[in-house]
Amino acid sequence: RSGRVERSRITKSILVIDEAQDLGEQEFALVKELIRCNEDMRVMAVGDDDQNIYEFRGSDSGNMKTMITEYGASVYNMLENFRSSQAVISLANAYVKGISGRLKSGPIVGKRSDPGHVRLVRHFTPDYEQAIVNEIVSDRSPGNVCVLTATNDDALVISALLNKSGRKARLIQSREGFQLSDLAEFRSFIDAVLEYNCACLDDVMWAEATDAVRRRFSDSGCLDLLENCLAAFNEEYPTRKYFTDFENFLLESQIEDFTRSKESEVVVSTIHKAKGCEYDNVYISLKGLHNVTDKERRMVYVGMTRAKNNLSVHFDNADIFTDEV
């Protein structure tokens, strides 16, 4: 707006906004300015206001509503769900009705025929982590397992109890400010690629850079992480490999995306850190959730919809679930 940015750098024909429900005040101001500077620009915003759980960072799903009202945007409801079983979808649909001011006009439609299983367990004492652990230890359902919690403290307690019970737990901890390119193995691969001074790498260059890192870090515990990352990138970009695409791929990825846990290992995480993930069997602990507003309801909804097959929700506050749910 001040004219300090060259016009050529802000001239755009198409703008795609992913996770639009997470737009904050500054990001939305940028979007509005780009629209002002490009009268014929097409804008596509993809988001789910039911999954806005980053209000503490300044995100506001109201910006999506503003795009509809101020710019006359067309709204397309994408209601098909290919992840979750019928039982999980039914619970999520019933629960999300309690959130006010929603944009979606209809229920989610499950596309899987699997019935799945849902269990709601109300506890009358606040210390029920051991009950969750006992259920996990005795459960023989196939597939991977994840425990999602409302707080970091609860995640630590459940992780410790699982390990004490003999069931190995992997605690997902916050890595704010951490990037995959900070790891020596990734940095070495990037340096090897940059030596070619080529925007688009052919298969030979890519293989040579990969082999160089393998030789240098043959004993590294993070080499598998790099290998998994490169395999995922190859799958997404099977023909042309541009360095800028790889840079963006790293920026958009998390270390958990390339960590292949064993099925016997239980992943323990807060709900906020698990957004975007999915697991066959999900246990949710809502300990400490007492003041239930729309913000908390959205968090619970995100936790529920991480489950693919089976879901078990443990809580001690009767206000979390209505009689209808």
Question: What are the roles of these predicted feature ranges?
Answer:
Residues R1-I10:
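Conserved helix/coil segment N-terminal to the catalytic DExD/H
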Residues R9-I10, N38-E39, S138-G143:
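Glycine-rich phosphate-binding loop signature in dinucleotide/nucleotide-binding domains
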Residues S13, G116, G143, N309:
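Nucleotide donor/acceptor-binding cores
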Residues I14, Q21-S113, C146-K164, I172-L180, ...:
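Conserved helicase motor core of SF1/SF2 NTP-dependent helicases
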Residues Q86, C146-M299, M304-S312, N317:
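Core RecA-like ATPase module of SF1/SF2 helicases and allied nucleic-acid translocases
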Residues L103-K104, D319-E324:
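Short, charged/polar "capping" segments at the starts of alpha-helices
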Residues H123-P142:
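Conserved interdomain hinge at the start of the Helicase C-terminal
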